[in-house]
Amino acid sequence: MNTARKAFGRQCLRAASVLAIVALATPGALAADLVRVGKASATTFAFAPIDIGKEKGIWAKYNLDVESIGFGGDARLQQAMVADSIDFSLGSGPGMGFLAKGVPAVTVAAMANEPLAMGLSVGKNSPIKSYDDLKGATVSVSTGGSLTFWLVREFSRQRGWGPAGIKTVSLGVNPAQVAALKAGNVQGIVTSSSIGYMLEKNGDGRVLVEFGDHVKDFHTHVIFATKKFVTTHPDRVKRFLAGWIEVIDFMAKNREETIKLVTLVSQLSEDIQTREYDKAMPMLSRDLRFRPKALDVLARSLVELEILPTAPDMKTLYTEEFLPVRN
């Protein structure tokens, strides 16, 4: 009897060992690889793929555990990369200039093209009724050297007023800018157009300038990765970008569900989010690749923002080596 029990025990032990090996070899049984992602703004539509990918299980499909945190503009985002507190950052095209100044990162994807989702909004009692009324006015931006800062200067330049024809003040996150507008401390705010749509709905203001009508060749948003991360975890970079492309594909094919999911991030009403989806979805890149004309405009913007004294060789600031191979 004892011999039979011992034999049975050994069989059970062997079976358990086999099951353990099978479990370890099964995708999903292993702990997902952590990636830390910073957003220049926590609620921006173009950055919502992080949250949608998590909700739909797309990051899990690529064995990634994606954590994200919002920052108040590009400058703070770049500081986080220097401090090695994030692996990826979702920022603006002009933010590429900080790489030439020593931020230890590389641009790995161009995720949004012309700034279809960016606007300049004015208050309900504002004396500013037309483009020409903006000359000499003071508007808020997130930070100096940011996308919002450049858009104002570029619009002013196109109007023939020079880059400083519209005055700017840096106020950080969107709530602070909206509060300043309502208090009359600024004559306009440069944010995502959805903030302007919200002001319109509440009777507090309106969108005056849609920057996508004035800036055509551009990379509004890009994805950065720290040099340390691309060196130590190149496979995670590839998986993250492949997952991002899949999320964008989902968003394009599932309009109604995407709108509902984005409202959880933006905290905007569904009607406003619908308006933003229809406006902004076309600017989101399906292949994440860089466009020569857009890079030329970015190079010029870095000089105009006084981030760099001369236009850089943009090829030194980005790479496409981690993007999926074209079919």
Say what each PLM segment does.
Residues 47, 78, 117, 131, ...:
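Extracytoplasmic/secreted envelope proteins and their assembly/folding machinery
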Residues 26-31:
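Sec/Tat signal peptide C-region and signal peptidase I cleavage site
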